């Protein structure tokens, strides 16, 4: 074990002396030189800051031209300088005891060393953007699922070799050191992982862009698998600190909740009183691949301003009261997606979303003002700023931007609204109704009173647009449009709109009355006596007509209010997705089929109104992390056969593998790489679950968030059917009929999603039974890998041979794990849903195992079920009956089984069509077995999957966002 001893503190050179394993004259010289550079650099890296919108600038931004210190060419690390840097950080930025240099300490010292190099480029990138005053994109997301940073950072910097050599000299392997890093618990699933892939591509392609998120102390949760199924505990990933982040105490902004709105003498609104907290920035440098560009992920944490601490209560012994406000502030960033079943949970989620939006918008505006100098032109704001909302969580940035522009900067509503519409854009990630966020109008009004006023103004703008488009003649049609499109659902119609509707109704009534009078006039007798009588009654009629007119006006008002007024028994809600569509200049889906569903179903009325807003941007994944760094052996093979590693930034070159797909030498190398990766999975499974599996079996994997629409239940039902059939056969028949399989699951069920947690429990119960059945042996194993995260995926994906993407058609927006598996030569079985459609087109129909109903059939199939016309396949009924025998334990699965039965009712009637697709699914699995027996054919299919995955690079996606939505250009550092 490598160790070093502590000595005196008389000078820099004698602060500490390493033991004999580390001492050498050359390394001491390099260490001293490195210290000087580092100290100079550290003074300089604090030279940039931006001020709060709500307060004076905290410190002046220094002119970078006057600074001394690093330029990009000062420090070019090699293994010797890397070694000195690691030693330096082991000594001077200690997180552990000084006596021993063990693996955890080696990791932190190595990470700090890498961060030094990142910050050099990070500073240069920031300063160049400042100097050039470029248009910059800002990506707001509640999640960033980054994974481990060490291997990714040194890979992008081109320093893998020097760091591996340096750590070898210190007695460790780079891989062992990298495994000490905990995954950053800043996300959960595809939404957050996509955001992280996008940041990697933005930096690699030299686009001026930043990410904004929240710094969650405990993440979503750490998943434990026990005899009771899934259990959740806090994920304390920050316990030992995060070496990749830089706390920016010089950058903080006030964030307000509650309070009231006051109108000043000049008509400007002021949001006063309430509860104030402070959002503090933590910066994480994001390096591009083989480029100097290093962009920023700015994360916000929350605290109470010192002046708000109740010192009087504390000194009087009421410590709980004194600390109450601090706890309320801090808990905003404790947990990702806190449970929202309670009012407190809903309030906390809204506070999270608003904190992200408010702090980020204040920061963006401060940067715009700083770069504009003394000539701030707000009409130029959209020419310098693009804000992308990753799903509906950052929706509050719309009213927040309007609030700042109007209430703080003094712009008119018209000008602020135009600027906002040109600035923000919205990515839709779901067609699930429950995921299209709706918030209580009352709760939002209490928490953010000014923002509800602004949202009401946007809603009023929308209503006038709808009236202009559809007119007021057909009130039934108009009511239908408002019900589908309003932002404020079941809320009073604005008076300006109400007056128009009442006037229109009165005009219609007048026209109708005039027609009736004309008809009556034609039928009158022209006799003189009647004329005389009419003259006598004229005065009386005029008085009566006045009264009738008043009644008719009242009737018109009552009619309009009855048709368009709020219903007392319905909740008043704010539709956040509608707010995004109305306010943004672009709305995009994330796969071709999803974007069509968005236009034709989810937002069809808006699409009719503004077809030019709607776009498709099929998702992608970074080939650096998801092929090169996690699967280096396969990457070397690809580089060899394509002639260079250009495919890492130009994935179209992967398509060149197609011409070698039948080459026996390539196939042999390909199978060997896959086999080596499978051995890593064997080790992972043993470590995480205790199960021992055979590397000779097919590795069949489904790893994703546990949800009914993703249909892990269909997968495990297929496994149960397979197991039952095996049990009915002789050993010889089993071996002939079935290919050995290891069926691997991974993913988290939300803590409050009971049915998803039942599915986890069922999978683990099936595994417990099957894995201990001596008759079955290695023919079938079922494994649930606990606490699925990016690092687990980086082991499972390279060694997988079949991956399941089997969601109910039309319900998965895109998916990105399907892209990662395909890129690593894994074959897919799936429905025509999300990105599966496009993957199948690129890899070839014969190289994708397709089954199941299609998206356009789903509504009809559900209707058929509701009418009692669906007849389940006997094999599906056989599986359910087998489960009910108790073969998988004593747990009561009636609630789970019940969701698949009946024709109607909440939580019943097989809404996700497991029973409908089951027979097609198991027959498709037979085709998988047949194909796998021919390993030459299977390997060719695997190669063609990698070759066809070229389209699904996040680089392609980001180019499209930059060109079509953000309108930004690459900016390469000199």
UniProtKB/Swiss-Prot annotation:
Q: Where in the cell is it found?
A: Plastid, Chloroplast; Plastid, Amyloplast
Q: Which UniProt keywords apply?
A: Allosteric enzyme, Amyloplast, Carbohydrate metabolism, Chloroplast, Glycosyltransferase, Plastid, Pyridoxal phosphate, Transferase, Transit peptide
Q: Which cofactor does it need?
A: pyridoxal 5'-phosphate
Q: Which residues carry this modification: N6-(pyridoxal phosphate)lysine?
A: 820
What EC designation does it have?
A: 2.4.1.1
User: What domain of life?
Assistant: Eukaryota
Transit peptide: where? Answer: 1-81
Q: Which reaction does it catalyse?
A: [(1->4)-alpha-D-glucosyl](n) + phosphate = [(1->4)-alpha-D-glucosyl](n-1) + alpha-D-glucose 1-phosphate
Q: Which InterPro entries match?
A: Glycg_phsphrylas, Glyco_trans_35, Pyridoxal_P_attach_site
A Pfam family cross-referenced in the UniProt record is Phosphorylase
Where do the segments described as Disordered lie? 509-551
Query: Where in the body, by tissue, does this protein show up?
Result: Leaves.
One Gene Ontology cellular component annotation held by this UniProt entry: amyloplast
| Chief location | plastid
Provide the GO biological process annotations: glycogen catabolic process
Q: Does the keyword Chloroplast apply?
A: yes
Q: Which GO terms describe its molecular function?
A: glycogen phosphorylase activity; pyridoxal phosphate binding
Q: Which family does it belong to?
A: Belongs to the glycogen phosphorylase family.
What is the annotated role of this protein in its UniProt record? Phosphorylase is an important allosteric enzyme in carbohydrate metabolism. Enzymes from different sources differ in their regulatory mechanisms and in their natural substrates. However, all known phosphorylases share catalytic and structural properties.
The name of this protein is: Alpha-1,4 glucan phosphorylase L-2 isozyme, chloroplastic/amyloplastic
Ranked from the top, the taxonomy reads: Eukaryota, Viridiplantae, Streptophyta, Embryophyta, Tracheophyta
């Amino acid at each position: 074990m490598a160790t070093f001893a502590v000595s005196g503190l008389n000078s820099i050179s004698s602060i500490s002396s390493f033991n004999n394993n580390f001492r050498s004259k050359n390394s001491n010289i390099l260490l001293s030189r490195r210290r000087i550079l580092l100290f100079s650099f550290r003074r300089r890296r604090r030279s940039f800051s931006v001020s709060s919108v709500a307060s004076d600038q905290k410190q002046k931004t220094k002119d970078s031209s006057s600074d001394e210190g690093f330029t990009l060419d000062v420090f070019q690390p090699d293994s010797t300088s890397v070694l000195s840097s690691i030693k330096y950080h082991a000594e001077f930025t200690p997180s552990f005891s000084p006596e021993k240099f063990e693996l955890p300490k080696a990791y932190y010292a190595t990470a700090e060393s890498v961060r030094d190099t990142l910050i050099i480029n990070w500073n240069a990138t920031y300063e160049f953007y400042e100097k050039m005053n470029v248009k910059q994109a800002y990506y707001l997301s509640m999640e960033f699922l980054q994974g481990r940073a060490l291997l990714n950072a040194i890979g992008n910097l081109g320093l893998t070799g020097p760091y591996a050599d340096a750590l070898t000299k210190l007695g460790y392997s780079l891989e062992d050191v990298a495994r000490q890093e905990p995954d950053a618990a800043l996300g959960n699933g595809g939404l957050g992982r996509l955001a992280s892939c996008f940041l990697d591509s933005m930096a690699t392609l030299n686009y001026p862009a930043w990410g904004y998120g929240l710094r969650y102390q405990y993440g979503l949760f750490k998943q434990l698998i026990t005899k009771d199924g899934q259990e959740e505990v806090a994920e304390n990933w920050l316990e030992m600190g995060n070496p990749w982040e830089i706390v920016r105490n010089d950058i903080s902004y006030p964030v307000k909740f509650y309070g009231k709105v006051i109108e000043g003498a000049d008509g400007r609104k002021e949001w006063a009183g309430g509860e104030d907290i402070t959002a503090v920035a933590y910066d994480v440098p994001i390096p591009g691949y083989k480029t100097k560009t290093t962009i920023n992920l700015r994360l916000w944490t929350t605290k109470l301003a010192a002046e708000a601490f109740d010192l009087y209560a504390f000194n009087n012994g009421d410590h709980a009261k004194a600390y109450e406000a601090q706890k309320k502030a801090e808990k905003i960033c404790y947990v990702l997606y806190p449970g929202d079943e309670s009012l407190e949970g809903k309030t906390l989620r809204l506070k999270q979303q608003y904190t992200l939006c408010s702090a980020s918008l204040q920061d963006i505006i401060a940067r715009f003002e700083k770069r504009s100098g003394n000539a701030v032109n707000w009409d130029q704001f959209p020419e310098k700023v693009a804000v992308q909302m990753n799903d509906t969580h950052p929706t509050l940035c719309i009213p927040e931007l309007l609030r700042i522009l109007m209430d703080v900067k003094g712009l008119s509503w018209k000008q602020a609204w135009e600027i906002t519409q040109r600035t923000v854009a919205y990515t839709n990630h779901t067609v699930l109704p429950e995921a299209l966020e709706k918030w209580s109008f009352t709760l939002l009004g209490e928490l953010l009173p000014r923002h509800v006023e602004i949202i009401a103004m946007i809603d009023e703008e929308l209503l006038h647009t709808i009236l202009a488009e559809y007119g007021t003649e057909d009130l039934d049609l108009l009511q239908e449009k408002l019900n589908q499109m309003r932002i404020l659902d079941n809320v009073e119609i604005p008076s300006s709109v109400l007056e128009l509707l009442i006037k229109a109704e009165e005009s219609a009534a007048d026209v109708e009355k005039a027609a009736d009078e004309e008809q009556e006039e034609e039928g009158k007798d022209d006799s003189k006596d009647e004329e005389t009588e009419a003259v006598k009654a004229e005065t009386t009629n005029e008085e009566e007509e006045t009264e009738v007119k008043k009644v008719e006006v009242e009737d018109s008002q009552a009619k309009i209010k009855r048709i368009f007024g709020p219903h007392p028994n319905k909740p008043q809600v704010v539709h956040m997705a509608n707010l995004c569509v109305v306010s943004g200049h672009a709305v995009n889906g994330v796969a071709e089929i999803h974007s069509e569903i968005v236009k034709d179903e989810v937002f069809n009325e808006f699409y009719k109104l503004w077809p030019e807003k709607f776009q498709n941007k099929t998702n992608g994944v970074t080939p650096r992390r998801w092929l090169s760094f996690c699967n280096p052996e396969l990457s070397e093979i690809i580089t060899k056969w394509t002639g260079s590693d250009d495919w890492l930034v130009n994935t179209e070159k992967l398509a060149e593998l197609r011409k070698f797909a039948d080459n026996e030498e390539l196939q042999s190398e390909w199978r060997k790489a896959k086999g080596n990766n499978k051995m890593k999975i064997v080790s992972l499974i043993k470590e995480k679950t205790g199960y021992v599996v055979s590397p000779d079996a097919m590795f069949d994997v489904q790893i994703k968030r546990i949800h009914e629409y993703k249909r892990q239940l269909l997968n495990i039902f297929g496994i149960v059917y397979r197991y039952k059939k095996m049990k009915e056969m002789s050993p010889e028949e089993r071996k002939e009929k079935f290919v050995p399989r290891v069926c691997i699951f991974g993913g988290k069920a939300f803590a409050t999603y009971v049915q998803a947690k039942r599915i986890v429990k069922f999978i683990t119960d099936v595994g417990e039974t099957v894995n201990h059945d001596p008759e079955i042996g290695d023919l079938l194993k079922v494994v649930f890998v606990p606490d699925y995260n990016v690092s687990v995926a980086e082991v499972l994906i390279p060694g997988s041979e079949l991956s399941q993407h089997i969601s109910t058609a039309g319900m998965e927006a895109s998916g990105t794990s399907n892209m990662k598996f395909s890129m690593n030569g894994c074959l897919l079985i799936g429905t025509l849903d999300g990105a599966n459609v496009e993957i199948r087109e690129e890899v070839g129909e014969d190289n994708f195992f397709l089954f199941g109903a299609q998206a356009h059939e789903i509504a009809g199939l559900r209707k058929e079920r509701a009418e009692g016309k669906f007849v389940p396949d006997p094999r599906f009924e056989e599986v359910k009956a087998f489960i009910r025998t108790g073969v998988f334990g004593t747990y009561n699965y009636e609630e789970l089984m019940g969701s698949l039965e009946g024709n109607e009712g909440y939580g019943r009637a097989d809404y996700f069509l497991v029973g409908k697709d089951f027979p097609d699914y198991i027959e498709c699995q037979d085709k998988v077995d047949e194909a796998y027996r021919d390993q030459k054919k299977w390997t060719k299919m695997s190669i063609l999957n990698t070759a066809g995955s070229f389209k699904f690079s996040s680089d392609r996606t980001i180019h499209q966002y930059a060109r079509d939505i953000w309108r930004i250009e690459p900016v390469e550092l000199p």
